[in-house]
């Protein structure tokens, strides 16, 4: 098959797959607002208002474009929902093109000279992309106004562009693909941060393309550097840029005495001059790689510039104006999700610190100062008491991998893992009344008459008299594996590859929201006798049984790919 014929087939079948996806999602689209955040996203998109942190300005601007086509106010929700329909259909299109690119890279790829080879090649790409089209979770997101449909589109575009960059990496056009990737990465911040998750996979594409001999040291370094690039963009580049704008604004207004917004304008001018002279110098000195690196950072910031919409609309005092991020400092707090409870990934407080009181050595810690404009003085003033403003959790209740951290869910944690151990403090051991109460409580525990909520209430009431142990490391690992991974990830995964019980909200019981396979002996081990289900349960419209076939085919595909192209296997595993 000639290259021209291949392009015709690739484009024609790709757009046909797009049309199938568009018809599927368009004919099943939600006509109004659905549960959770969809109603807020519809309202904030249609009128360009400020939603909950961390915001999705590019998503909202696209939603406003779709809202323009509403024939009446009653149709606004439907038209904004169509944004997800088109985003998901384009995702399937780029997935088809991604599969054809990957198939061409396999070592045993044939030239497609015969009709049967061409049908097998393009047919497999169509089956793969349409299988994703009809999968449970993707279809669900494709028909309502949520950020995940467009975020998935960004993932698909980024990975496809990474493969196109690989094709032309050492040509004159190669760097243009890198700059487009950088721009879309910046753009993803205006939709959902999950777009950044393609960076490690794209980094490994670069490594395998440029280093033909793969060593253990080089492989590990490439993975670490790719992950570091992700963290630098997410945790350093963009927060530092916002912080620079915020500090410049306060400095030039409060210290120099300039009017409001002067610091923001000066900061923007400084950044412009940095890129202008940086690009001019590197071009003059023929520093090609450094010049490309500066351009890549510039394109990330250009994509991120959709965030300018948020303070513009916040200053317009829109009806929905959550947190009112009207200047650079407030925008940084909005980006950093400062309104939500702080969580620790590797080391931090457990939920048991609610029973322990403040840390005895350092009971208070500083909060972050919050600046607001004082129009009388023409300066920014701190409006909160930030010195020693926050209670510091008891350091005895800090631990590694604090999965059991939320004090609001203490009772559920203890129901799920195990109750916390406790002993009477030495100074109260002679109190007979207290001892009797605790002995009675322990008897009730032995009888099985105490649940997590009652245990939690007991610890709250008697915590001044008790030494209460923090959850063990193994309790945290158990919760992570069984609930966070098993129930909140693996269950969703299996909905798509083995089957789904129903669309009822799961309560960690055997009746609702579980994955099933359709194979009685397997389902009965986990969910009880499936033959005794009533007609309502059996006829639930969300009930699907795939008999593990997609799951088994996926495993076979992974094994096949690993055997024939281990490099491509690792790239796809990182992306997955």
Model-inferred region functions:
Residues 6-35, 132-134, 192, 230-235, ...:
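Transmembrane signal-anchor helices characteristic of membrane glycosylation enzymes that use polyprenol
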Residues 29-41, 51-63, 78, 321-323, ...:
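Extracytoplasmic catalytic/substrate-binding loops of multi-pass membrane glycan-assembly enzymes
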Residues 166-167, 198-226, 231, 236-264, ...:
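Perimembrane helix-loop-helix junctions
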Residues 108, 115-119, 158-177, 206-214:
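Membrane-interface transmembrane helices that cradle and orient dolichyl/undecaprenyl
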Residues 1-24, 112-126, 269-302:
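Start-transfer (signal-anchor) and selected internal transmembrane alpha helices
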Residues 15, 82-114, 157-161, 552-559:
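Transmembrane-helix motifs of polytopic, lipid-linked glycan transferases
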Residues 123-126, 161, 168-186, 215-228:
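Short hydrophobic alpha-helices at membrane interfaces in multi-pass membrane enzymes
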Residues 57, 70-93, 97-98, 110-114, ...:
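Loop-to-helix entry region of an early transmembrane alpha helix in multi-pass inner-membrane enzymes
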């Amino acid at each position: 098959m000639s290259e021209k014929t291949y392009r015709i087939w690739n484009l024609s079948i790709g757009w046909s797959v797009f049309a199938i996806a568009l018809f599927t999602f368009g004919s099943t689209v939600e006509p109004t607002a659905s549960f959770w955040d969809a109603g807020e996203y519809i309202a904030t998109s249609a009128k360009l208002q400020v939603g909950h942190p961390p915001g999705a300005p590019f998503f909202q601007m696209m939603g406003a474009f779709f809202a323009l086509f509403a024939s009446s106010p009653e149709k606004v929700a439907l038209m904004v929902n169509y944004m997800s329909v088109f985003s998901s259909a384009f995702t399937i299109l780029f997935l088809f093109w991604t599969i054809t690119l990957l198939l061409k890279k396999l070592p045993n790829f044939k030239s497609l000279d015969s009709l049967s080879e061409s049908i097998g090649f393009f047919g497999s790409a169509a089956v793969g992309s349409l299988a994703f089209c009809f999968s449970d979770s993707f279809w669900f997101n494709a028909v309502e106004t949520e950020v995940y449909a467009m975020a998935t589109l960004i993932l698909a575009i980024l990975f496809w562009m990474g493969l196109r960059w690989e094709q032309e990496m050492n040509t004159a056009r190669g760097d243009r693909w890198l700059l487009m990737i950088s721009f879309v990465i910046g753009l993803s911040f205006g939709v959902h941060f999950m777009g950044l998750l393609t960076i490690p996979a794209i980094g490994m594409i670069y490594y395998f393309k440029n280093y033909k001999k793969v060593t253990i040291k080089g492989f590990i370094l490439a993975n670490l550097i790719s992950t570091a690039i992700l963290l630098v963009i997410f945790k350093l580049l963009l927060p530092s840029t916002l912080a620079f704008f915020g500090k410049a604004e306060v400095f030039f207004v409060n210290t120099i005495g300039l009017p409001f917004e002067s610091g923001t304008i000066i900061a923007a001018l400084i950044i412009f001059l940095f890129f202008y002279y940086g690009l001019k110098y590197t071009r003059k000195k023929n520093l090609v790689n450094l010049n490309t690196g500066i351009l890549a950072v510039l394109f990330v910031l250009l994509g991120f510039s959709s965030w300018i919409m948020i303070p513009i609309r916040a200053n317009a005092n829109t009806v929905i104006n959550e947190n009112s991020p009207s200047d650079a400092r407030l925008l940084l707090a909005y980006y950093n999700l400062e309104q939500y409870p702080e969580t620790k990934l590797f080391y931090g407080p457990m939920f048991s610190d609610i029973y322990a009181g403040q840390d005895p050595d350092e009971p208070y810690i500083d909060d972050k100062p919050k600046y607001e404009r004082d129009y009388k003085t023409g300066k920014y003033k701190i409006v909160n008491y930030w010195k020693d403003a926050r209670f510091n959790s008891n350091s005895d209740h800090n631990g590694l991998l604090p999965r059991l951290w939320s004090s609001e869910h203490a009772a559920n944690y203890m129901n799920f893992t195990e109750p916390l151990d406790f002993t009477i403090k030495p100074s109260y051991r002679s109190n007979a009344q207290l001892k009797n109460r605790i002995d009675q409580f322990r008897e009730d525990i032995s009888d099985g008459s105490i649940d997590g909520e009652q245990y939690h209430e007991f610890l709250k009431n008697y915590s001044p008299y008790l030494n209460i142990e923090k959850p063990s490391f193994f309790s945290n690992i158990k919760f992570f594996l069984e609930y966070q991974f098993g129930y909140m990830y693996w269950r969703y995964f299996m909905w798509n590859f083995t089957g789904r019980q129903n669309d009822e909200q799961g309560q960690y019981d055997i009746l609702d929201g579980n994955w099933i396979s359709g194979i009685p002996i397997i389902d009965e081990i986990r969910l009880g006798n499936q033959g005794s289900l009533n007609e309502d349960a059996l006829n639930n419209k969300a009930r699907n049984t795939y008999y593990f076939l997609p799951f088994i085919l996926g495993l076979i595909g992974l094994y096949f790919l690993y055997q024939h192209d281990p490099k491509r296997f690792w790239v796809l595993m990182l992306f997955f």
